[in-house]
From Swiss-Prot:
Family that this chain belongs to: Belongs to the eIF-2B alpha/beta/delta subunits family. MtnA subfamily.
UniProt name for this protein: Methylthioribose-1-phosphate isomerase
Organism phylogeny: Bacteria, Pseudomonadati, Thermodesulfobacteriota, Desulfuromonadia, Geobacterales
Pfam families from the UniProt entry: IF-2B (PF01008)
Binding site for substrate: 46-48, 89, 196, 247-248
């Protein structure tokens, strides 16, 4: 891949600005945790695994900003940093997973001096980024055998390198199949209202030389019924214990259409996206975003002023529509409640 989604460089967090793609490839530098939190909230960085990495790096920056004479003061301020990060996006469980991991690491080194704790947190954030890249490659290896020679794959939103530290989850499966020499092509849903499929997925795949065709969201059923789509692969922001999966709004519609047309529908996600504390998708909090995202496109109005708007950022696909969940530890099928718990224990 010829771009970096996020990295720690010279005690700064550097992110590609995803709101500027595909028109401009711009990298922003962040030196304080509040600006990282705002970047997450403003979708300069997005995608559950990437948000987790950003939160970890934001906490590492925050630890460096803290002025404290005592451990008690330091840890009290660190809790505040973590709370700011936790309030950015409520649905992506990787955010909370990364925050808790950083808190545990800090607590486990409480006996060390404060500068050492700051360096340990920086190292842990970098480790989370490096691990995410390895995890995505493993997801790709596990999912590639599910993609047949000559297949046309439908994907929704962006679950690629831009949504992770690199390589991607759903696009990781597609990349691995392409790297294995399989002749494949991809249909990318544009994914309203933020157009992640149009702006980001198409951009990534074209950079990699993987054939991609862009369609509007309401065309998916048409192409499925015509027999032009062989398999669907999407990412995830949170997966409940029973396999119900929260992903970008519109994913549920794709899954229902896929089942109607007897097309396998797969979810690709790291184990860190599992939330086994939730029995089902009914318990997953769904973020609702500003109405302007629906009523305006690139700053221009596309709806009458004052119209009522609903703008949930995610929906939940019930497990019965999912043919398999592809993780770095393997592919889970069937009894998700049993198999996901077994997977975590491996």
């Amino acid at each position: 891949m010829s771009f970096r989604t996020i990295e720690w460089r010279d005690n700064k967090v550097v992110m590609i600005d995803q709101t500027r793609l595909p028109g401009e490839e711009v990298y922003n530098e962040y030196t304080d945790f509040q600006s990282v939190a705002e970047a997450i909230r403003g979708m300069i960085i997005r995608g559950a695994p990437a948000i987790g990495v950003a939160a970890a790096m934001g906490i590492a920056l925050g630890a460096r900003e803290i002025i404290a004479d005592t451990h008690e003061s330091f840890f009290r301020q660190l809790d505040n940093v973590c709370n700011v990060m936790a309030r950015t996006r409520p649905t992506a469980v990787n955010l909370f997973w990364a925050i808790e991991r950083m808190k545990r690491v800090a607590e486990s080194h409480r006996d060390k001096d404060l500068n050492s704790i700051r360096e340990i947190l920086k190292a842990e954030a970098i480790r989370i980024e490096e691990e995410d890249l390895e995890i995505c490659r493993a997801i790709g290896r596990n999912g590639a055998p599910l993609i047949k020679e000559g297949a046309t794959i439908l994907t929704h939103c962006n679950a690629g390198g831009l949504a992770t530290a690199g390589y991607g989850t759903a696009l990781g499966v597609i990349r691995a199949a392409h790297e294995a020499g399989k002749r494949i092509q991809v249909f990318a849903d544009e994914t309203r209202p933020w157009l992640q499929g149009a702006r980001l997925t198409s951009w990534e795949l074209m950079k990699d030389g993987i054939p991609v065709t862009l369609i509007s969201d309401n065309m998916a059923g048409y192409f499925m019924r015509k027999g032009e789509i062989d398999v669907c692969v999407v990412g995830a922001d949170r997966i409940a214990a029973n396999g119900d999966t929260a992903n970008k709004i519109g994913t549920y519609s794709v899954a229902v259409l896929a089942k109607e047309n007897k097309i396998p529908f797969y979810v690709a996600a790291p184990v860190s996206t599992l939330d086994l504390s939730l029995k089902s998708g009914e318990d997953i909090p769904i973020e609702e975003r500003h109405s302007r995202e629906v009523t305006h496109l690139q700053g221009l109005p596309v709806a009458p002023e004052g119209v009522k708007v609903r703008n949930p950022a995610f929906d939940v696909t019930p497990a019965r529509y999912i043919a398999g969940i592809i993780t770095e530890k393997g592919v889970v099928r069937g009894d998700y409640e049993k198999e996901l718990r077994a997977l975590v224990g491996r």
